[in-house]
Curated annotation (Swiss-Prot):
Annotated keywords: Hydrogen ion transport, Ion transport, Membrane, Transmembrane, Transmembrane helix, Transport, Vacuole
Protein name, per record: V-type proton ATPase subunit c'
Gene: VMA11
Cytoplasmic compartment residues: 38-59, 120-136
Record membrane topology: Multi-pass membrane protein
Membrane-crossing residue ranges in chain numbering: 17-37, 60-80, 99-119, 137-157
Pfam short name (any one): ATP-synt_C
Length: 165
């Protein structure tokens, strides 16, 4: 009546835990980075909004860039979740590969969000006093955003290695 669960040497029963952990780390850490970036830069935007309300729309760039970081984590989490199946053997190699994918994009987006938050907060406040700083601030924000993109690229490369393609 009951079906016996067989355990393979290369596909132990605990291997999917690492894949699920990678999926969770990708979402949790990248959303944490997006939240930090949004909160820190949002403080600067609210600070200048009381003095120069006309600058608020132009100052929303750091908030938008922080939100993109959560999308990076979402993409990797969906790809990891697509590789998990209860009916197929899931090797320990794939479990560790998916864990490293999640940690890679998660920590990259966390550090990127922190950088965007600091640059966005200080940049918006200084932009209020000197509008010529806008281009330089946007360039620094782009370089900060690219840190999260690098993590996603490495996670995608790792994910394709884990799937055997």
């Amino acid at each position: 009546m009951s079906q016996a669960i067989s355990e393979d040497q290369y596909a132990p029963l605990f291997a999917p835990f690492f894949g699920f952990a990678g999926c969770a780390f990708a979402m949790i850490l990248s959303c944490l980075g997006a939240a930090i970036g949004t909160a820190k830069s949002g403080i600067g935007i609210s600070g200048i909004g009381t003095f120069k309300p006309e600058l608020i729309m132009k100052s929303l760039i750091p908030v938008v860039m922080s939100g993109i970081l959560a999308v990076y984590g979402l993409v990797v989490a969906v790809l990891i979740a697509g590789g998990l199946s209860p009916t197929e053997d899931y090797t320990l190699f794939n479990g560790f590969m998916h864990l490293s994918c999640g940690l890679c994009v998660g920590f990259a987006c966390l550090s990127s969000g922190y950088a965007i938050g600091i640059v966005g907060d200080v940049g918006v406040r200084k932009y209020m006093h000197q509008p010529r700083l806008f281009v330089g601030i946007v360039l620094i924000l782009i370089f900060s955003e690219v840190l999260g993109l690098y993590g996603m690229i490495v996670a995608l490369i790792l994910n394709t290695r884990g799937s055997g393609n």
